[in-house]
Amino acid sequence: METKVAVLGAGAWGTAIAKVIAEQKSERGSKEVIIWSFETEVRDDINKNKLNSRYLPGVKLPDTIEATSDIEEAAEGKQYIIYAVPSLFLMDTLKKTLSVKSIREGQSIISVITKGFLPAENGPKLILETMEDFLPGLYRQSLVYISGPSHAEEVSAGKITGLIAASESAKNSIRFRDLLKSPRLMVYSSLDVRGVQVSAAAKNVIAIAFGILDAMKTMGKADMFGDGTESLLLAAGLNEIQILGNALGATHPETFTSISGIGDLDVTCRSVHGRNRRFGREIIEKNILKSYKNIDDILANIGEIGYLPEGVAAAKYVKVLAEKHKLKMPVSVGLCKLLNREIEPMEFCKNLLADWDM
C-alpha cells in the first residue's frame, strides 16, 4: 500500500525531509512524496533534474519525488502533510490549504517543522496553538511538531542525527516517528509539545548571540572572549529557554536536556550551516545592522540578507513574552536591544557578562 505525503515548502529543510521520507523502504509499501513550491523555477528543477539547486544545491533527489506549484493539488488526499515554510509565511500557507477536502474532514495527519513564534492579538503564540485556531476542531490536540539537532545539508547527506516528533496525540507522534525514522535518522516521540516548540524557536535567538560572540573572538575584537565564554553563553541560553518554556506550559523538564533542547541549541550555535549563527557573525564581520533602523526594518527587508535568520523575529517575540511573564532573560532581551540599534555589539557582549545569573 502506497503512503502519500505532501511537504508544503521547498526550502532546504522541506526538501531534505522529503528526500528522507522518499528513500525509506518499509513492509507497508512505497511512499509517494510531493513537494509544494510557489517558485516555478524550483518546481521545474525538482521535476526535470531531481535537484533543488537554489536551496539545497548538489543533492540528488529520488525519482519518486515530484513538485507542484498548486498547493491544493499537493495537499489533497495525502495521509501525511508537513508544513515546511518559514514562520513569516506559515499562516498564509495554512490558509491556502483550508479548503482542501482531506483537511476539512480531518483525514490528513498534519505536522509542522517551522521554527518560531507567530504574532497574535494578545501577544506572540506558539505555532501549533495558532494553527489550531484556523484548522477544523478535529485537529485540536492532534497536530505534530518536529524538531531536533539537524541541518538540511547534513540530513540530506545521510549524516547521523535525531529528531523529536511531539504531539498531545501519542498515536500521531508515533506515526510521524515511524514515517521519518531511518538507520541514520533517529526519531523519538514526545508529549511535551510546548517545551519542544519553545526550544526550537528560542534557540535561534541564542544562536545569533553566539555568532556575535564567536566573531568577536575569532576576529580579535576583544581578548576577553574565549571558548569558555561561548560555553557560558550556551549554559545561560539553555537556562533562558527553560525559563521561557516553563512559563509557556512545558510539561517535561527533560525536554530541555534532550536533543530538542541542549542538542538543538548546540548544533544551531556551533554548526557552519547555521543561518542564525551566520547572521550573528555578519553583524560583526560586515556590520550589516548599519543598513537597518531597527528589528522591524530588518524583518521588512529580510530578503536583502540573502538567507532567512529565524532568530530575528523570534528575538522580538521572546522580548515581548519575557516582559509579559516578568522573566529575566538578559541574553534574549539584550539581543533585541542590539537589533533595535539601542546598544552596540561590544556593549551587548559586556552586558551579557554582567547580567548572567545562573
Language-model segments: which ranges?
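NAD(P)+-binding Rossmann beta1-loop-alpha1 motif at the extreme N-terminus of oxidoreductases
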Residues: 1-57, 64-69, 73, 120
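Glycine-rich nucleotide phosphate-binding loop and flanking beta-alpha elements
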Residues: 14, 88-91, 117, 171, ...
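Short, well-ordered alpha-helices that flank and scaffold nucleotide-derived cofactor binding pockets
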Residues: 19, 23, 95, 99, ...
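Rossmann-like NAD(P)(H) cofactor-binding subdomain of soluble oxidoreductases
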Residues: 61, 68-160, 176-178
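Internal alpha-helical scaffold of NAD(P)-dependent oxidoreductase catalytic cores
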Residues: 134-142, 160-254
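NAD(P)-dependent Rossmann-like dehydrogenase/reductase catalytic/cofactor-binding core
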Residues: 203, 208-214, 231, 235-238, ...
